[in-house]
């Protein structure tokens, strides 16, 4: 597929997602990085968003709970170019009923070329990157060209 570029602003739109066994770890990570994260716009799946907001006081736009469609809501935001970064602490040792949604969410993050952290170490590398607080250009699929070609 042909590519185009999208400008990711210095103020990032960050999605926070965590499986049940990882919610405490994500809340701790957000608390540690609260000073840096407060300058960005946070989104999260339902339960995670409410827990993060209560634990840190940071404003979080909460979607529905993951199993109730929240993963798909975050995926839609990624597809629309409204999420710049996904922090998703997932539990690879426990299956969840909405595993297909999890796979779809990770797939969309890859398709739309946004950074994804699936554990604390990767999240630390991302938040400490010199690009984290800067405007950057990323390559994304050229959906308009794709659509034009499909409609010929």
Curated annotation (Swiss-Prot):
Pfam families on file: MGS
| UniProt binding sites for substrate | 19, 23, 45-48, 65-66, 98
Query: Known InterPro entries for this protein?
Result: Methylgl_synth (IPR004363), Methylglyoxal_synth_AS (IPR018148), MGS-like_dom (IPR011607), MGS-like_dom_sf (IPR036914)
Task: Identify one Gene Ontology CC term for this UniProt entry.
Answer: cytosol
Q: Where is the signal peptide?
A: none
Residue ranges of domain MGS-like in the record: 5-152
Recorded E.C. number(s)? 4.2.3.3
Q: Name one GO molecular function term.
A: methylglyoxal synthase activity
Q: Where is the active site?
A: 71
Q: Cite a single GO BP annotation.
A: methylglyoxal biosynthetic process
From the UniProt record, list the coiled-coil ranges: none
**Is Lyase a UniProt keyword of this protein?**
yes
Q: Which reaction does it catalyse?
A: dihydroxyacetone phosphate = methylglyoxal + phosphate
Provide the alphabetized UniProt keywords.
Lyase
Class of enzymatic activity (EC top level): lyase
Where does the chain cross the membrane?
Answer: none
User: Family assignment?
Assistant: Belongs to the methylglyoxal synthase family.
Q: Tell me which HAMAP family the record gives.
A: Methylglyoxal_synth
The task this protein performs is described as: Catalyzes the formation of methylglyoxal from dihydroxyacetone phosphate.
Could you identify this protein by its name? Answer: Methylglyoxal synthase
